Amino acid sequence: MEKRRKSILNKPSKKQSISYNEGHGFKKEVEIQLIKYLGRLSPEIEMPARAKGINGSNSYDVDIHITIKGKGLFANRGDIWVECKWKDNSPVRESDIQKLVIKAQDAFRHVTELGGFYYDTLIMVSNQDFDINALSYANALDVLCLRFYQGQLIEKNAPMNWVGDPAWMKQENYLKAFRS
């Protein structure tokens, strides 16, 4: 019995953690595909970036910051926060989307009180699929979910207003979606 317990305890884990180089490589691949995906919008990529929270001491890593500069007289400018989520074997969960939304809301509150630019679009990109709760939560708060699969980005949901004025910016809509 003692030998069996030792062998179980010393057994190497099948779960492999991703190294910095692999994670950075994933982000670079996502960046290349996002340029293609958003090509007609003339994206400018900044990698990595930071977002300040409400008290200024909270500062969040932004995996990829994309600035959209529309063309023409009435062109809008937009700033996109892209979160790259590498998962070993599990799908992206609702809690993963919640963490991104909470960080973005904190950064948005910082900007509304102190001024500056803000991220008006959230995109979550993962190498794994998204579970159904994550997708419904993302749809309710207008977060676009993309899966990076075989070198391509695949849309996993269809939020109504993921560019410009998404629901996650409006506190009452956030609370309704969070409680449901």
Where are these regions (language model features)?
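Mixed-charge (Asp/Glu-Lys/Arg
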Residues: 1-180
